[in-house]
């Protein structure tokens, strides 16, 4: 089939050529050339044709066609040229040779022989035999295939050859001339072939006619049969001539018989005569008749015809009738190939020689010796058999037989008959024979025999000996004298038995048994170059190193110094199995170790079962200092092996191994600190750091000593040892001249001191040191650490992976990212941990984040290989973190093994998934189990027995809470009202896919991911929802899978790789586009800035920045072409399901424009919150499992059963936090001052970095005040998170979490079924205090706002813990959670603004109540206080409207009616409307207790006094005071408290009045009449306040003073 296909391809090419011929030539000529082309190219390999351009094929065809047009068969034609397109019509990179000759044998072979003789590479040679017809002028008339015509046309051979290009014209002429000369020889030899055979027959006839008496009859008959045998195609005749014996002055001589020459002897007779003379030395010389009838000789000149071999002379004597020699016949030619394969016993003359030798030997042909001798003769060099005489043959053959398979060297030399050649037979043991030995033997023989090498052939059989025949030409006129025994001894020495020496050395080194086993593998393994360079004893040592190699140890080393070496030079041998080691792999390692490679010699050791390489390097230190071999050998070899194995990095730090006398692990430690310096943006390169350490070796060693003193568990540093070491370093630093060097070395010392723990001294179970390093650091001790500064940090470093884990506190949590930012992954993680810190405000742990990079990702790795390496690096990273983390066993802290700790107990380490590690939780938990970590599979949430965030849709649902709240504020119910959306992502994604299924009212008009753009200008909400659901349910999907039939008119799915996209009218309308075509990136930008209701980010990347930010500052190059500015956003709402979709400044800019947007860490906090719930739940139930009350299977089922409730708990946190943000936004518009002060105070305390968080300056905030602007939601998102984090931290440090009443907050994080079964266990939870603190902080900030605690701290002087306790008391005393839930239940039933107004009413009441409890100091416990006040407050709340008086009652009624009209239930409206008055109930209850009255009675008097003195009105005026600073705010709060206090004092006074009416109103009237003077003064003051003539704080200070006087007037009365 292949042949058919190739032939079809050839025909196709010729068809194309034919078409080209027809298009350019006339019809007849085109047909002729086409016929020729088919004949000429018939045998050309297809690949040679296919490589040709059609133009060149056409040109070459015509060129050769023209070449054969004129040809005289008597004159061979040769053309040599370099084809040039302009000159010849075709092009080739080679020199082209065309040969045209009358067809005959040997043409192609002889041309090739000549070209090879000239050293020319033949790239192509094609031969076509053509049947041609020519006219009398030798012009071509027709051409045909010889097989296709019976006409008697001449046969011509056309040869086309391509050889290496030769540009010199003279050289081209020389090639042409030499080929013509060869062709003449061929022509002459072939034309005389039959005449030469006739001469052979004539010789036979002549021999048969005469038989000289002196010739043995058998020899005579043998000569005749030999000539007959020659004529049986066993000899190729090349030349013939005859000689006759003449008498010349009494001496005989040979003279050529004129005109007897045939074949090549007819050509250039003088040259050939000289050639014959030099070959045979006969013509014209003194002739001495030979005893034999026939003789043989070799020509000393290579044949130029047929084969490049030395042709043979066969000389036959001629006799007269008297038996005298009268002349010679001489034939020149070559035995055909069959002769060399034929048994000599079948060849006349040779068979008699063989029989004669057997007779001389006297061995029986059937005996062992006879058979052996016959075999020797059978394989004896055939040419020698013809030329050697019987006696010499017998002597040589018997000498060979005498070797008898012994491993020895023997030499046999034969001189040819005419004294021109030596034929040397050398026998050597086969196992030592090699080309290299053959060359050395040849050189020795040439030197000893004064000869020139001619040829060789090798004979190998099953014998233990190899036979090499050397044909050597005499340099002189005659052979030199030689002693064959001495010469043989030299050959023996040359082929010296180095292997025997190896055996002896092996026996000495390993013992005889082991040595024999070793020799069975390595006897023939070492190459000649190795044997020349090294002794056998050295080889034994090298074999020891080779023996160290195996799968686990692919490299062995030997570091040594030659005896002859001096100074800094050393030698290194590398031993490697399999392939040689590329120099490019080794040289960088040498250089980084501080060594220069002076020379290298590789040796391949070919054992019987494997191949090994020895690389011997000559080295010197780069500083040329003398190296102490004994000191450096061990550390150097181990370091090299570790670097080779990839367990140590190959960089400039390795120079410290020799330069500072360190081992590889000490260098790894210093390198790891340098890597950390790079990550914290220390401004020195790694090479500079390495060079500096190397320049100060003493300081470097002291730094290593300091590290050892601090962390080596085997060290027991005495008192002051560490300080002494530090002192030595500082003393040495004083002598460092370079400021940069000094700074670097001091930073190293600082880093070592800032290190708290390390796994440097930990070993694996196999006893090996771990091949990665982990340092736990206190970053606050590191100068210039980039902000924000984490509380703790673990840096991991190895040749394979680097990573960092940053924590905001001891209990901290966050994901681990597979980063691709090798240069600054810590910067990336630091940015993420900053976001995580604020995101984690709602959960127990502080923010944490980790990231790692894979440093040795396989080049060109596919997805599977990439993932495999990523997992391996992740596993190393996890192990490193656990290596330096405490454990809890039986409730007791257990430090990690072989770790010296310079910090307190620290057992809490929890991780989570992040970019690139979404599926790695089970892997982390397996390692957690492997380490026996107390958290088990709570170590990494979301694993096989954890909560699957995608299945729960928890992140999307959490973000959707933000979306719903934003839209509720805009009067849109996302679950009932349709709204338009532009999305970032695709339905296969967690956040995007789940998010776009959270409402069937979504009209997704456009979306994009990294591959496609989806556009549906006027979608059907229900149908598109169902289609999105279908895509989401697919195992894998993309926008391409969307059913395009469901896409509305003008829409479509477009690849982002498209050059441009046509914009339809519908697209123009929905996205506000004017252009007819846009690039994909331009269309995406148009989608992002379009006027849609929602932009939903569920993808990866940053798409919105501030107009004041550059793309480079954003750090997301992939999306630079898409990114818009925040001010360009025209959507109403942004939902940030994904991270980093907008920069913080981009959010602020969008929010300032009116876009409703929080931040990513607010919107997508559901994921971390869910994970925190999982961890806390697992910690609880794992304790139950550990004591046997729950099986593992039951535990996992319980986790699954609680999924929905966990989701509800998480979403409730999202709901309330976004509610808190909206409330904070409203409050900031009412007065931004408290927020400004809050930021400033946090900043002053070092708890926030305003610049890092992009918070506005004081000046900007004051400017907003002037424009009645508040804080934006993105800014408040940051502040609310800090408010919670700071409060949480203070609460953990206080006794608040231990308060039995407040401790009940622990139950809030657990599903109800856990509370039902394991309530007691909740109060024993290991993180109980942290949970309580977190829940209290969340509750307080969610309902009381960002600045609540700060304001109370300022106004009361209380700390955060006391404020939180007072808040809980006030909250529960008023049973506010019930009211909050009722208000929250009104979502989509009343406007959000109404809900928020109610929340703010309760917030103000609760703030004052909290302050009241802070000041009263009841002396009761939290529980007792709540139990005392709660029921009394409940009583006072009943029918409170009836108790109010005057304007206060009117205000209550109006507010109640307003709320009821808005849709608020009457009961709730009544309670909330009274919020401003309810606060007073606390004082009323306290007064009732003091006066021993019932609270209801006290309340009646209280409200009556207030109404009569218009105290609610005066409090309103105080509240309306504008405050410009904190002092005025404190004063305002003081005025209100004082008025409340005085109202209670007046109430008590009225109640304590002796006598008087019972009715409240009458009793108050009576009391006022008794104090008429003071009363009138107060009334006058009210008039002044009401007139507004005198305002501000001084007036109210006077008013409060007057009220105090009125209250105190009772005593005077």
Swiss-Prot record:
Keywords: NAD, Oxidoreductase. The keyword Nucleotide-binding does not apply. GO terms for biological process: glutamate catabolic process. It comes from the Bacteria. It holds the Pfam family Bac_GDH_CD. InterPro entries: Aminoacid_DH-like_N_sf (IPR046346), GDH_C (IPR048381), NAD(P)-bd_dom_sf (IPR036291), NAD-GDH_cat (IPR028971), NAD_Glu_DH_ACT2 (IPR049062), NAD_Glu_DH_ACT3 (IPR049064), NAD_Glu_DH_bac (IPR007780), NAD_Glu_DH_HM1 (IPR049059). The keyword Aminoacyl-tRNA synthetase does not apply. Signal peptide: none annotated. It catalyses: L-glutamate + NAD(+) + H2O = 2-oxoglutarate + NH4(+) + NADH + H(+). GO terms for molecular function: glutamate dehydrogenase (NAD+) activity; L-aspartate:2-oxoglutarate aminotransferase activity. Its EC number is 1.4.1.2. The active site is at 849. Belongs to the Glu/Leu/Phe/Val dehydrogenases family. Involved in arginine catabolism by converting L-glutamate, into 2-oxoglutarate, which is then channeled into the tricarboxylic acid cycle. This is NAD-specific glutamate dehydrogenase. It comes from Halomonas elongata (strain ATCC 33173 / DSM 2581 / NBRC 15536 / NCIMB 2198 / 1H9).
């Amino acid at each position: 089939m292949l042949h058919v296909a190739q032939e079809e391809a050839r025909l196709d090419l010729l068809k194309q050529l034919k078409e080209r011929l027809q298009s350019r030539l006339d019809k007849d000529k085109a047909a002729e050339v086409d016929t020729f082309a088919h004949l000429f190219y018939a045998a050309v390999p297809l690949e040679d044709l296919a490589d040709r351009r059609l133009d060149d094929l056409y040109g070459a065809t015509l060129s050769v066609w023209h070449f054969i047009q004129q040809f005289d068969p008597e004159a061979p034609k040769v053309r040599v040229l370099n084809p040039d397109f302009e000159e010849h019509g075709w092009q080739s990179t080679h020199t082209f040779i065309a040969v045209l000759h009358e067809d005959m044998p040997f043409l192609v072979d002889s041309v090739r022989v000549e070209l090879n003789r000239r050293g020319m590479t033949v790239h192509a040679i094609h031969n076509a035999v053509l049947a041609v017809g020519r006219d009398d002028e030798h012009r071509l008339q027709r051409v045909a295939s010889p097989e296709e015509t019976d006409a008697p046309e001449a046969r011509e051979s056309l040869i086309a050859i391509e050889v290496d290009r030769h540009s010199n014209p003279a050289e081209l002429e020389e090639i042409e001339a030499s080929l013509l000369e060869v062709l003449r020889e061929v022509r002459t030899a072939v034309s005389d072939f039959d005449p030469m055979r006739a001469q052979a027959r004539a010789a036979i006839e002549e021999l048969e006619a005469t038989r000289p008496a002196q010739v043995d009859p058998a020899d005579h008959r043998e000569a005749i049969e030999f000539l007959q045998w020659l004529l049986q195609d066993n000899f190729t005749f090349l030349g013939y001539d005859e000689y006759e014996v003449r008498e010349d002055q009494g001496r005989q001589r040979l003279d050529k018989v004129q005109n007897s020459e045939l074949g090549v002897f007819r050509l250039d007779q003088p040259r050939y005569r000289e050639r014959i003379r030099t070959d045979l030395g006969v013509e014209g010389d003194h002739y001495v008749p030979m005893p034999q009838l026939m003789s043989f000789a070799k020509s000393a000149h290579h044949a130029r015809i047929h084969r490049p071999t030395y042709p043979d002379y066969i000389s036959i004597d001629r006799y007269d009738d008297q038996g005298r020699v009268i002349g010679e016949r001489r034939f020149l030619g070559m035995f055909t190939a069959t002769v060399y394969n034929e048994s000599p016993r079948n060849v006349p003359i040779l068979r008699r020689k063989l029989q004669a030798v057997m007779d001389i030997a006297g061995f029986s042909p059937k005996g062992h010796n006879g058979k052996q001798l016959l075999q020797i003769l059978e394989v004896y060099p055939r040419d020698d058999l013809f030329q050697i005489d019987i006696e010499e043959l017998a002597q040589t053959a018997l000498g060979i037989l005498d070797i008898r398979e012994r491993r020895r060297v023997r030499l046999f030399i034969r001189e040819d008959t005419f004294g021109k050649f030596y034929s040397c037979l050398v026998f050597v043991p086969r196992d030592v024979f090699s080309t290299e030995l053959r060359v050395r033997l040849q050189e020795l023989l040439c030197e000893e025999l004064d000869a020139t090498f001619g040829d060789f052939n090798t004979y190998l059989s099953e014998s233990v000996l190899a036979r090499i025949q050397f044909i050597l030409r005499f340099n002189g006129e005659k052979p030199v004298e030689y002693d064959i025994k001495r010469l043989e001894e030299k050959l023996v020495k040359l082929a010296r038995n180095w292997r025997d020496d190896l055996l002896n050395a092996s026996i000495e080194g390993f013992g005889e048994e082991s040595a024999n086993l070793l020799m069975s593998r390595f006897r023939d393994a070492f190459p000649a170059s190795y044997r020349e360079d090294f002794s056998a004893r050295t080889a034994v040592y090298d074999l020891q190193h080779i023996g160290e190699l195996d799968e686990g140890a692919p490299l062995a080393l030997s570091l040594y110094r030659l005896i002859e070496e001096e100074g800094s030079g050393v030698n290194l041998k590398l031993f490697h199995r399999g392939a040689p080691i590329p120099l490019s792999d080794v040289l960088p390692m040498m250089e980084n170790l501080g060594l220069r490679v002076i020379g290298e010699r590789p040796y391949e050791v070919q054992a019987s079962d494997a191949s090994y390489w020895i690389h011997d390097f000559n080295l010197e230190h780069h500083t040329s200092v003398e190296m102490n071999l004994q000191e450096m050998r061990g550390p150097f070899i181990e370091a090299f092996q570790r670097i080779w194995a990839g367990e140590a990095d190959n960089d400039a730090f390795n120079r410290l191994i020799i330069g500072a006398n360190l081992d590889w692990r000490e260098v790894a430690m210093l390198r790891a600190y340098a890597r950390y310096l790079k990550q914290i943006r220390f401004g020195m390169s790694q090479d500079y750091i390495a060079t500096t350490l190397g320049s100060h070796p003493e300081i470097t060693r002291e730094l290593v000593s300091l590290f050892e003193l601090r962390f080596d568990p085997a060290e027991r540093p005495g008192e002051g040892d560490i300080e002494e070491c530090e002192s030595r370093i500082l003393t040495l630093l004083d002598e460092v001249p370079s400021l940069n060097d000094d700074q670097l070395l001091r930073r190293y010392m600082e880093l070592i001191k800032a290190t708290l723990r390390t796994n440097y001294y930990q070993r694996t179970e196999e006893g090996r040191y771990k091949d990665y390093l982990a340092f736990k650091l206190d970053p606050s001790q590191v100068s210039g650490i980039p902000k924000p500064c984490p509380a703790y940090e673990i840096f991991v470093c190895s040749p394979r992976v680097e990573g960092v884990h940053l924590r905001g506190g001891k209990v901290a949590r966050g994901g681990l990212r597979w980063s691709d930012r090798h240069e600054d992954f810590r910067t990336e993680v630091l940015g993420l941990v900053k976001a995580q810190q604020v995101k984690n405000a709602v959960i127990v742990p502080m923010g944490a984040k980790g990231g790692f990079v894979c440093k040795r990702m396989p080049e060109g790795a596919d997805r599977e290989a990439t993932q495999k390496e990523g997992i391996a690096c992740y596993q190393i990273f996890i192990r490193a973190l656990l290596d330096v983390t405490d454990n809890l066993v039986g409730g007791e802290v257990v430090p990690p093994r072989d770790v010296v700790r310079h910090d307190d107990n620290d057992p809490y380490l929890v991780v989570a998934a992040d970019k690139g590690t979404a599926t790695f939780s089970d892997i982390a938990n397996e390692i957690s189990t492997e380490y026996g970590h107390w958290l088990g599979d709570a170590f990494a949430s979301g694993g096989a027995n954890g909560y699957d965030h995608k299945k729960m849709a928890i992140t999307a649902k959490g973000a959707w809470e933000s979306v719903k709240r934003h839209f509720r504020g805009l009067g849109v119910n996302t679950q009932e009202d349709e709204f338009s959306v532009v999305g970032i992502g695709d339905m296969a994604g967690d956040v995007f896919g789940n998010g776009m299924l959270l409402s069937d009212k979504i009209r997704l008009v456009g979306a994009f991911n990294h591959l496609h753009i989806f556009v549906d200008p006027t979608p059907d909400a229900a149908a598109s929802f169902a289609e999105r659901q279908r895509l989401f349910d697919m195992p894998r999907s993309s926008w391409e899978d969307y059913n395009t039939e469901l896409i509305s008119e003008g829409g479509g799915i477009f690849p982002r790789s498209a050059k441009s996209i046509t914009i339809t009218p519908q697209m123009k309308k929905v996205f506000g586009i004017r252009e007819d075509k846009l690039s994909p990136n331009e269309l995406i930008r148009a989608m992002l800035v379009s006027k849609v209701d929602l932009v939903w980010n569920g993808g990866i990347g940053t798409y919105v920045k501030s107009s004041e930010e550059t793309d480079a500052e954003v750090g997301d190059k992939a999306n630079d072409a898409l990114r818009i500015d925040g001010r360009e956003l025209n959507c109403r709402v942004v939902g940030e399901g994904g991270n980093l979709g907008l920069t913080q400044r981009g959010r602020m800019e969008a929010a300032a424009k009116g876009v409703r947007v929080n931040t990513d860490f607010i919107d997508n906090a559901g994921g971390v919150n869910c994970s925190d719930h999982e961890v806390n739940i697992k910690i609880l139930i794992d304790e139950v499992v550990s004591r046997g009350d729950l099986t593992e299977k039951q535990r996992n089922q319980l986790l699954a059963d609680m999924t929905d409730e966990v989701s509800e708990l998480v979403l409730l946190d999202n709901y309330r936090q976004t509610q808190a943000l909206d409330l904070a936004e409203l409050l900031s518009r009412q007065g931004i001052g408290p927020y400004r002060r809050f930021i400033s105070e946090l900043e002053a305390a070092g708890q926030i970095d305003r610049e890092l968080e992009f918070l506005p300056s004081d000046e900007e905030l004051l400017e907003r005040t002037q424009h009645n602007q508040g804080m934006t939601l993105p800014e408040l998102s940051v502040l609310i998170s800090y408010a919670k984090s700071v409060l949480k931290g203070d609460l953990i440090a206080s006794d608040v979490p231990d308060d039995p009443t407040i401790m009940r907050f622990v139950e809030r994080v657990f599903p109800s079924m856990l509370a039902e079964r394991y309530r007691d266990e909740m109060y024993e939870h290991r993180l109980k205090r942290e949970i309580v603190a977190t829940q209290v902080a969340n509750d307080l900030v969610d309902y009381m706002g960002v600045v609540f605690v700060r304001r109370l701290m300022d106004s009361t002087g209380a700390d955060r813990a006391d404020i939180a306790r007072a808040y809980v008391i006030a909250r529960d005393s008023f049973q506010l959670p019930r009211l909050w839930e009722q208000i929250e239940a009104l979502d989509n039933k009343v406007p959000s603004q109404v809900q928020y107004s109610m929340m703010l009413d309760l917030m103000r009441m609760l703030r004052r109540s909290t302050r009241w409890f802070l000041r009263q100091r009841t002396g009761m416990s939290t529980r007792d206080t709540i139990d005392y006040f709660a029921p009394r407050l409940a009583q006072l709340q009943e029918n409170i409207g009836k108790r109010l008086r005057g304007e206060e009652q009117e205000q209550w009624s109006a507010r109640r009616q307003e709320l009821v009209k808005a849709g608020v239930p009457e009961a709730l409206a009544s309670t909330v409307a009274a919020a401003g008055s309810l606060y007073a109930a606390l004082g009323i209850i306290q007064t009732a207790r003091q006066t021993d009255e019932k609270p209801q009675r006290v309340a009646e008097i209280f409200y009556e006094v207030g109404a009569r003195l218009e105290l609610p009105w005066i409090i309103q005026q105080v509240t309306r005071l504008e405050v410009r600073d904190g002092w005025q705010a404190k004063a305002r709060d003081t005025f209100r408290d004082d008025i409340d206090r005085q109202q209670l004092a007046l109430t008590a006074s009225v109640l304590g009045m002796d006598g008087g009416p019972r009715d409240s109103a009458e009793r108050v009237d009576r009391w006022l009449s008794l104090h008429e003077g003071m009363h009138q003064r107060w009334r006058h003051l009210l008039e002044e306040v009401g007139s507004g003539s005198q305002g501000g704080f001084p007036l109210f200070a006077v008013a409060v003073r007057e009220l105090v006087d009125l209250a105190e007037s009772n005593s005077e009365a």
